[in-house]
């Protein structure tokens, strides 16, 4: 499950970013919804909450408001990836 997440999460966030860049709020909302759910399942709750917030903004038709939230999500995803890689390597306490 961790390996699948590490492969798919960056692509989902990129899909949200691409959706926003293209003015496709529905695509962004769908990508964020998927990332929200998978992040929550693995315990990446801060990233899940950021995605939920982004999903709400996209649904409201305000995709321009998502730029800073997507930057924060990208930073949080980087931390989650580090954490999950440490878990896979047995380096967590």
Residue ranges and their predicted role:
Residues 6-7, 12, 38-56, 60-93:
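Amphipathic, coiled-coil-like alpha-helical segments
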Residues 24, 31, 69:
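DHp/HisKA histidine-phosphotransfer helix
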